[in-house]
């Protein structure tokens, strides 16, 4: 909640005394309200489905989970029929190469900045098109990515990655990570995202953590369930 703390500081001076006649901007208030709403929605999902997010998220039909569970939390006052109108169509044939393998990915998105709703999961390329650099790790991030998907006018977010990724494809993607890192070093891409964010993805791709995440994902693809944290009997990808 670093952003939330930063916004709240707008109300105070360094000594903790509230400023007189000083208010955060409309944009800051919008972000604050959105973050508070997302946190409340994440709590609802956790109460309904338990603390084990990976068991909830990594299922064969992630598409159905998002439509039936996540969207019902985002739109609790709407009839269930509305969820069929929310687009998470398949865009595998135009999947962005910088998408980190997993259930959610993007095709050719708009460049209007919808990904700003999910800063811990979404980046943009040289043209401002969005891609997933981190699969959601908790209910909060899943809701934020879902919000970004809704805001994309091209409806280019997809959640049928489990139908298309397989062990060999994940291995090949990981084998080519030096190419993905090279693309991330493009000056225009860095300008769009900020050097710190780009470095986060580069460091992730160079880490044992990313490899372990993909090995666990391959285990899921091969066995149709996500492995326990202490399960190290995982497929080799390098």
Features from the language model and the residues they span:
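Non-ligating segments of multi-cofactor redox enzymes
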Residues: 2-238
């Amino acid at each position: 909640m670093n952003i939330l703390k930063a916004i709240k500081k707008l109300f105070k001076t360094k000594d903790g005394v509230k400023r007189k006649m000083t208010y955060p901007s409309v944009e800051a208030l919008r972000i604050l309200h959105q973050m508070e709403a997302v946190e409340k929605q994440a709590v609802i999902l956790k109460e309904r489905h338990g603390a084990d997010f990976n068991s909830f998220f990594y299922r064969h039909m992630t598409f159905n989970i998002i439509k039936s569970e996540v969207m019902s939390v985002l739109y609790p006052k709407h009839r269930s029929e509305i969820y069929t109108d929310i687009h998470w169509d398949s865009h595998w044939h135009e999947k962005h190469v910088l998408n980190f393998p997993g259930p959610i990915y993007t095709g050719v998105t708009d460049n209007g900045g919808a990904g700003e709703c999910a800063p811990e999961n979404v980046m943009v390329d040289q043209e401002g098109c969005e891609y997933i650099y981190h699969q959601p790790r908790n209910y909060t991030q899943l809701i934020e990515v879902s919000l970004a998907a809704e805001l994309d006018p091209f409806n280019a977010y997809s959640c049928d990655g489990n139908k298309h990724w397989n062990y060999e494809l994940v291995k090949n993607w990981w084998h080519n990570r030096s190419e993905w890192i090279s693309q991330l070093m493009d000056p225009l891409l860095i300008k769009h995202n900020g050097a710190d964010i780009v470095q986060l993805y580069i460091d992730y791709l160079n880490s044992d953590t990313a490899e372990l995440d993909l090995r666990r994902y391959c285990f899921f693809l091969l066995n149709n369930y996500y492995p326990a944290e202490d399960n190290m009997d995982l497929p080799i990808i390098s």
